[in-house]
């Protein structure tokens, strides 16, 4: 009996340990957070990049209007603006004058102009077109072969000479190779290739400016008595100065082109895209 009594307290002591273990296990289970199953998008895709519902429709479908957004508090303290007084109260003498009067600090002008004169507004740093900064793409340097994308010479390869004061590019074919004369073009409408020619020794006339290439207005014929149907429109003719300048520039460049094999054929060829050729994958 004594042995049996000794065993009973031992069994009683084990029970609280088991309870403690169970309690600890329950605590551990409570810490675990069940993750929700990921569901598919509420906006089914019709075509790649285009969903069935619009942005405003998804706003109501997701009930985003129930969410409360709190703006982050800025740490910078706002300076209180000092209000400028528009009026001042001044004491006034006399028994029947009320004692004070409200006087405006900024008084209206006594006299007004009889005619409305337009007021000149400040430009706020705006500069005229002549004073704009002319930037040039890093890939376009003197001697770079460009591909023209617009105009009557589109697809042809030309040689870049210099940038004019207006920002336009001065290019030449040369004329004897691809029938492109000395002309101006915008850098937006050209593709710069990796092929280049050394034109450091080429002397370009200084009078080749924007005024030189500016289109001259042709005079319209005036109708006179008896010459209503006989009048002819004045046609544009290339000046002798242009022909001289074209030969002077091309003669210097042709020497350098002939020194490089297969460059003449490259400048004569016209750039075009065919089936299976993608411009964004080409290396110019």
UniProtKB/Swiss-Prot annotation:
Pfam families associated with the record: Ribosomal_L6e, Ribosomal_L6e_N
Residues found modified as Phosphoserine: 123
Location in the cell: Cytoplasm, Cytosol; Cytoplasm; Rough endoplasmic reticulum
GO cellular component: cytoplasmic ribonucleoprotein granule; cytoplasmic side of rough endoplasmic reticulum membrane; cytosolic large ribosomal subunit; large ribosomal subunit; nucleus; postsynaptic density
GO molecular function ontology, one term from the record: structural constituent of ribosome
Basic and acidic residues composition-biased segments: 1-25
Modified residues annotated as N6-acetyllysine in this record: 235
Entry keywords, A to Z: Acetylation, Cytoplasm, Endoplasmic reticulum, Isopeptide bond, Phosphoprotein, Ribonucleoprotein, Ribosomal protein, Ubl conjugation
Disordered, as annotated region: 1-42
Chain positions found as N6-succinyllysine: 90, 203
InterPro entries in UniProt: 60S_ribosomal_eL6, Rib_uL2_dom2, Ribosomal_eL6_CS, Ribosomal_eL6_KOW, Ribosomal_uL6_N, Translation_prot_SH3-like_sf
GO biological process terms held by the UniProt record: cytoplasmic translation
UniProt cross-link Glycyl lysine isopeptide (Lys-Gly) (interchain with G-Cter in SUMO2), position: 5
Skewed-composition ranges (Basic residues): 26-40
Assembly information from the UniProt record: Component of the large ribosomal subunit. May bind IPO9 with low affinity.
The protein's role, per its UniProt record: Component of the large ribosomal subunit. The ribosome is a large ribonucleoprotein complex responsible for the synthesis of proteins in the cell.
Family of the protein in this entry: Belongs to the eukaryotic ribosomal protein eL6 family.
Protein name (record): Large ribosomal subunit protein eL6
Lineage start: Eukaryota, Metazoa, Chordata, Craniata, Vertebrata
């Amino acid at each position: 009996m004594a042995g049996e009594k000794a065993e009973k307290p031992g069994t009683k002591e084990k029970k609280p340990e088991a309870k403690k273990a169970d309690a600890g296990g329950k605590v551990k289970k409570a810490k675990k957070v069940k993750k929700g199953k990921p569901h598919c998008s509420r906006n089914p895709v019709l075509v790649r990049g285009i969903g069935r519902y619009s942005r405003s429709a998804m706003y109501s479908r997701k009930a985003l209007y129930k969410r409360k957004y709190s703006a982050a508090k800025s740490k910078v303290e706002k300076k209180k603006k000092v209000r400028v007084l528009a009026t001042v109260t001044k004491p006034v003498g006399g028994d029947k004058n009320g004692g004070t009067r409200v006087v405006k600090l900024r008084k209206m002008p006594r006299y007004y102009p009889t005619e409305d004169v337009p007021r000149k507004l400040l430009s706020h740093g705006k500069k005229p077109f002549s004073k704009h900064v002319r930037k040039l793409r890093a890939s376009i340097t003197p001697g770079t072969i460009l591909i023209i994308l617009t105009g009557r010479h589109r697809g042809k390869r030309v040689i870049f000479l210099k940038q004019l004061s207006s920002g336009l590019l001065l290019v030449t074919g040369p004329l004897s190779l691809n029938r492109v004369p000395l002309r101006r073009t915008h850098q937006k409408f050209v593709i710069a290739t990796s092929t280049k020619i050394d034109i450091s020794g080429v002397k370009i006339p200084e009078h080749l400016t924007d005024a030189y290439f500016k289109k001259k207005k042709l005079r319209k014929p005036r109708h006179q008595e008896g010459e209503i149907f006989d009048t002819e429109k004045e046609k544009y003719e290339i000046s002798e100065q242009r022909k001289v300048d074209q030969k002077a520039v091309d003669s210097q460049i042709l020497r350098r082109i002939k020194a490089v094999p297969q460059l003449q054929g490259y400048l004569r060829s016209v750039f075009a895209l065919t089936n299976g050729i993608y411009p964004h994958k080409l290396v110019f």
